[in-house]
From Swiss-Prot:
Alphabetized Gene3D superfamilies for the sequence: Isopropylmalate Dehydrogenase
Name of the protein in its database record: 3-isopropylmalate dehydrogenase gloI
Cleaved signal peptide residues: none
UniProt keyword annotations, A-Z: Amino-acid biosynthesis, Branched-chain amino acid biosynthesis, Leucine biosynthesis, Magnesium, Manganese, Metal-binding, NAD, NADP, Oxidoreductase
UniProt: NADP(+) binding residues: H294, G295, S296, A297, P298, D299, I300, N307
Gene, per the UniProt record: gloI
Record-stated family: Belongs to the isocitrate and isopropylmalate dehydrogenases family.
GO MF, any single term: 3-isopropylmalate dehydrogenase activity
The keyword Transit peptide is annotated on this UniProt entry: no
């Protein structure tokens, strides 16, 4: 019996539709291989500026409801200079989507999908070679969602409240623990905080994380590190943080962007924002939002040169975490690595391939990989 998965697709703005086309191309190759077992029902919606132009809102209620009913969400990129003057920031469509789905746990891998990419890194090869980090960022709490007092026009004072509750920290810690347990041998977890000075994303965070790992993941090696020390280590010795990094919303926002410089291009990196904790990673379905970490690239959109790797690898993450197809995810990752090692690259990583050329090459490599399995 064929299993149907409903997937909501938000191509997004500027370069978003370009990379999304390559991601869907790869997803269709998986569907053809497994046509007797699975079917992907794709439902397209607008988000961000594209939605604002048509619906006068960054995301419609219909799009939100369809996303909530779907198995997973794929997203290209949101925003751009065309909509700088809108009454409501068009980027808020993504925030509303995350909130509506309660996407609490952001996962960002930081590694080299192809070993030769170490030569493209902003860092020295001997510093970053062997880096393999997965960052788990809590997405729904912290200072971004706390009470806010804007300045009164005199620019004398303003405030933002950093607030966390126990439940928000617990589920982020559990997600990190499950990720660590899913690998053999189990991965170490480094929790980042500011426990020497701050209450919420400091001492409360550290105390709750410590308790969760002591009671639920006693075999996982847990260490705590101050965020400023971690930021230094990302630049100086990133391999010392190999494994899982767990941290709060704002700290995760900053440290993940810093770490994204390691592989050499923002176009290489995927992300997942999960809405639940899998019972067993790689074997359970969890609704999530899957998107590359790069922006909409308005400066190069329409030229056919954007790197679609992050989007394609986001499709792989969707197959792994939301559709319970880990072998297919592994095959996509292997195909991407082979294509890059065979020197089919977009310009941001030293090649001349177009966006579509790269996607086509991945599909060919993927078919060969799937035929061997």
């Amino acid at each position: 019996m064929t299993k149907q998965f409903d997937i909501v697709v938000f191509p997004g703005d500027y370069g978003g539709p370009e990379v999304m086309a390559e991601g869907i191309k790869v997803l269709k190759a998986i569907e053809r291989k497994h046509q007797s077992d699975v079917s992907f029902n794709l439902k397209y919606h607008l988000i961000g500026g594209a939605s604002f132009d048509i619906h006068d809102t960054p995301i419609t209620t219909e799009a939100l409801e369809d996303a909530k009913a779907a198995s997973a969400v794929l997203l290209g990129a949101v925003g751009g200079p065309k909509w700088d003057g809108t009454p409501v920031p068009v980027e808020s469509g993504l925030g509303r989507l995350r909130k509506f789905l309660d996407a609490f746990g952001n996962i960002r891998p930081v590694n080299f999908i192809a070993p030769s990419l170490v030569n493209c890194s902003s860092f020295k090869e001997h510093v970053v070679s062997g880096t393999d980090i997965t960052i788990v960022r809590e997405l729904t709490g912290g200072i971004y969602f706390g009470a806010r007092q804007e300045h009164d026009g005199s620019f004398n004072s303003a405030s933002d409240l950093d607030h966390y509750d126990r439940d928000s920290i617990v589920r982020a810690a559990r997600l990190a623990g499950k990720l660590a347990m899913s690998r053999q041998p189990h991965l170490p977890v480094t929790s980042l905080d500011k426990a020497n000075l701050l209450a919420a994303c400091g001492r409360l965070w550290r105390g709750v994380v410590k308790e969760v790992f002591e009671t639920e993941f006693p075999t996982i090696k847990l260490s705590h590190m101050l965020i400023d020390t971690a930021a230094m280590n990302v630049a100086r010795r990133p391999t010392s943080l190999n494994g899982i990094i767990l941290t709060s919303n704002m700290f995760g926002d900053i440290i993940s962007d810093e770490a994204s410089a390691i592989p050499g291009s923002l176009g290489l990196l995927p992300s997942a924002s999960l809405c639940a904790i899998p019972t067993v990673l790689d074997a359970s379905k969890v609704r999530g939002i899957y998107e590359p970490i790069h922006g909409s690239a308005p400066d190069i959109a329409g030229q056919g040169i954007i790197n679609p790797t992050g989007m394609i690898l986001s499709v792989a993450m969707m197959l792994r975490y939301s559709l319970a197809m880990p072998e297919a995810a592994d095959s996509i990752e292997a195909a991407v690595g082979k294509v890059i090692e065979d020197d089919c690259r977009t310009s941001d990583i030293g090649g001349r391939a177009s966006t579509a050329d790269f996607g086509d090459a991945v599909v060919i490599a993927l078919r060969n990989c799937l035929d061997k399995n």
